[in-house]
Amino acid sequence: MTAEIQQPPSQPPAQSSPMSAATDKHGGQPSAMESASCATKTKKTNAGIRRPEKPPYSYIALIVMAIQSSPTKRLTLSEIYQFLQSRFPFFRGSYQGWKNSVRHNLSLNECFIKLPKGLGRPGKGHYWTIDPASEFMFEEGSFRRRPRGFRRKCQALKPMYSMMNGLGFNHIPDTYSFQGASGTISCPPNSLSLDSGIGMMNGHLPSNVDGMGLSGHSVSHLTANGAHSYMGSCTGASGGDYSHHDSGSPLLGGGVMDPHSVYSSPASAWAPSASTPYIKQQPLSPCNTAANPLSSSLSSHSLDQSYLHQNSHNTASELQGIPRYHSQSPSMNDRKEFVFSFNAMASSSMHSGSGSYYHQQVGYQDIKPCVM
């Protein structure tokens, strides 16, 4: 009897899936993908970690700290980098933008000076030090900021300020000094006269020649009835107090101020005489007499008295010269009149309670240009 040997059923070969086949063909691919995913997880983990906090100092202060820490008080750019990295953890990280900030502050700020490199020193890199003129900014650890060019602008403006003060544009509040209760007004001889100021404004004229032929100042006070006529003249060369001694006549009662363009004498002796005649001078203006028929009548006359107290028979017709507004001369209306008021104090403020009148230089001028 033959024994049947039962063989175990042969197991079918395991069917390989397409993924497994791909895995067999590309054996290294799973490891590469796993490394990429691990790197992504690492980045996400590092993103949650904050970098060290920035030092509570400006870059100017940090650079000054680095330079002052050196015995020679000078450092190269790389040495400044090393000092900051060794001192503050913020500069040890992956962020490198702070180096640009250090370079910009060194080159753009005026308190840092780049020293020339010596001939015996090879390699590149200049030494940087602190400007001696700016050391006061960093005394006792005070790192105060200053705008770039602050001191240079101030030094550049100093000559202009001194020139403006030398011209005496602020002479109006300085030349008038009210002394006590008498109301005395003083006129210093060294004050800037009006003609010199106009000559400076003209620019093209020499200092000894007035642009419009003005060499003095005159103001005529005419009352409404023509009974009293006061005319005062004051030049920059005379420096006394000029007073009117008649305490009975009111100066400002219904008076009309009529400024005239005059050529006054440079020196004056003030006398209270009422019979002193007018002194006529030749005009200094280079006007053509033939082209301007009014030049002869417009040649002004100066009065060397402080105030002339005339009687009632001395009317305004006796005054030589043409008023500013004259009805009989139509050509005067065609001419343009330029009035320069360099004095803010009118003659109305010169009235004192005791009846003694002190008159000072009044700068109302009529500049009548020549009609060519």
UniProtKB/Swiss-Prot annotation:
Q: In which tissues is it expressed?
A: At the late gastrula stage, expressed in the presumptive ventrolateral mesoderm. During neurulation and tailbud stages, expressed in the lateral plate mesoderm and in the neural crest-derived structures of the head and branchial arches. During tailbud stages, expressed in the pronephros and pronephros ducts and in cells that migrate from the dorsolateral plate to the ventral region of the embryo (with the notable exception of the heart). These cells may represent hematopoietic or endothelial progenitor cells.
Q: What triggers or suppresses the expression of this protein?
A: By bmp4, probably acting indirectly via t/bra. Also induced to a lower extent by fgf and activin.
| GO function terms (MF aspect) | DNA binding; DNA-binding transcription factor activity; DNA-binding transcription factor activity, RNA polymerase II-specific; RNA polymerase II cis-regulatory region sequence-specific DNA binding
Q: Does the keyword Nucleus apply?
A: yes
Example GO biological process: regulation of DNA-templated transcription
List keywords of the entry alphabetically: Developmental protein, Differentiation, DNA-binding, Nucleus, Transcription, Transcription regulation
Where is this protein localized, as stated in its record? Nucleus
Note the InterPro entries from the entry. Answer: Fork_head_dom, Forkhead_box_regulator, TF_fork_head_CS_1, TF_fork_head_CS_2, WH-like_DNA-bd_sf, WH_DNA-bd_sf
| Region of interest (Disordered), ranges | 1-51
Please list the residue ranges that the record marks as compositionally biased, kind Low complexity.
Answer: 13-22
Concerning Pfam families, the annotation shows: Forkhead
Specify the DNA-binding region ranges.
Answer: 54-148
The Gene Ontology CC terms held by the record are: nucleus
The UniProt entry, under PANTHER family, shows: FORKHEAD BOX PROTEIN BINIOU (PTHR46262), FORKHEAD BOX PROTEIN F1 (PTHR46262:SF1)
Q: What does this protein do?
A: Probable transcription factor. Required for smooth muscle (visceral mesoderm) differentiation during gut development. Also required for normal proliferation of the lateral plate mesoderm. Acts as a downstream mediator of bmp4-signaling.
Q: What is this protein called?
A: Forkhead box protein F1-B
Show the taxonomic lineage: Eukaryota, Metazoa, Chordata, Craniata, Vertebrata
Recorded name of the encoding gene: foxf1-b
